[in-house]
Amino acid sequence: MAEAATGFLEQLKSCIVWSWTYLWTVWFFIVLFLVYILRVPLKINDNLSTVSMFLNTLTPKFYVALTGTSSLISGLILIFEWWYFRKYGTSFIEQVSVSHLRPLLGGVDNNSNNSNSSNGDSDSNRQSVSECKVWRNPLNLFRGAEYNRYTWVTGREPLTYYDMNLSAQDHQTFFTCDSDHLRPADAIMQKAWRERNPQARISAAHEALEINEIRSRVEVPLIASSTIWEIKLLPKCATAYILLAEEEATTIAEAEKLFKQALKAGDGCYRRSQQLQHHGSQYEAQHRRDTNVLVYIKRRLAMCARRLGRTREAVKMMRDLMKEFPLLSMFNIHENLLEALLELQAYADVQAVLAKYDDISLPKSATICYTAALLKARAVSDKFSPEAASRRGLSTAEMNAVEAIHRAVEFNPHVPKYLLEMKSLILPPEHILKRGDSEAIAYAFFHLAHWKRVEGALNLLHCTWEGTFRMIPYPLEKGHLFYPYPICTETADRELLPSFHEVSVYPKKELPFFILFTAGLCSFTAMLALLTHQFPELMGVFAKAMIDIFCSAEFRDWNCKSIVMRVEDELEIPPASQSQHFQN
């Protein structure tokens, strides 16, 4: 009984839905009936005659003005559409049509779609969020010794405010803790990391170091008749040395000296906090801060050694650091190690590092993907020839190299243009967006020399990298080896990269058809209005001639013959059969 009642209710509901779907036809006939009934009270016939009389009295100048006004409005719409497309990457009218008009006109219900596809899209949404995350550049330069020198020479600012603000947030996260207010020097540095003015930050760092040089006297009564004053030094402030090395030092050698002083102070603080970390949450947070400071100092010292040409020393320091702190993956020290090993041409060691970090469970980067492609290209690039490959086909090793290049290009399609020097390089930012133009600049800035060193590697890349796009015709919707390409990269890269750099956009955005159609229609109507206003008689003769041509019998016969000939060409009918066909 219950099942019968449920079935009846479902049928009743479907009938109501069906009736509402076609109810507009009933309303249409009702309106027509009301107009017919009320034609006399509303004086519809008189109004129609008045309108026809008004239209008959209009002059050609009115139509010219009307055409010009419509052209002006179309031009304004075109300008607005073009501005909206340049700013947001989509057509305003198309977006309104899809988002608002389509549901009103019987489009697909968004709720049902979301409920059906929520499970399938959850992973891709999480991946999209993670790929749109901004990461700290593991190969970032030194502000004082490198970025500021570029500004002095060119007068351009290589870093954006957004990028420097992210660095300030990183410094506050890595180098501060809740107990800093208990130590005067750390309290000063906590404020220094928030300063926007570089000179104010440097002055605060010097002030923090001066406070640590004040000696505290502790009175110790050793003999009853005398008093001995013991002089005790406060511990040095490691973060102050870090700030001075990053921003005040004008050369890498000066920065290295300051980092060595920071290492002495940071190592002492780390050992003391390591012994007290289990005494409470406050000591644990302080030990975590001291660990971050020590790792940062050692990593920057290794980078100084790499800059100064002591590459083997830098490799040893990086390996020791990765062994001592294996869980601190936020600094991505393995990418610094890969670059240094490539400089030494230790390709076997590079392969060993890739075997550990090029794992499906670990986040990818341009350094990982393109270094793997470089190693596979190195095995075949010296003998690779496009002509020979087209004749005999690709060997197994060449196929592996091409697949590795396609994998790397799919992950970050902006890198090949910089490696092939199709776009000019700039100084890399302090933060990068994975799969974006900022990551491509950061990778190519340091790895272009390694690709040039391998004979034929750039030639192989030049011949094969564009083939990736045939495998992923719709990269924003579906990828091949990775998730679909995130659509947020362009906006984030414009915030990270300086204004004088032309941001690389992938995939290339084509103008929507509506904008092109509006532009053509606007231009055509404006031209007709101008010609009609200047030469009214000539345009009238031309319009009459065109109407006569289109309405003539010869034009209709020619159009029919052209259609028949086109159909016969598509069907490939032989000449004999064609003549027989026309005879029949």
Swiss-Prot record:
Chain ranges passing through the membrane: 15-35, 62-82, 511-531
Residues with PTM Phosphoserine: 385
Keyword field: Glycoprotein, Membrane, Phosphoprotein, Transmembrane, Transmembrane helix
CDD domains with a match to the protein in the record: ST7
Bilayer topology: Multi-pass membrane protein
InterPro entries: ST7
Glycan attachment sites: 47
Any Pfam family matching the protein: ST7
GO cellular component, one term: membrane
Subcellular location: Membrane
Principal location: membrane
Domain of life: Eukaryota
UniProt record similarity statement: Belongs to the ST7 family.
Protein known as: Suppressor of tumorigenicity 7 protein
Gene: ST7
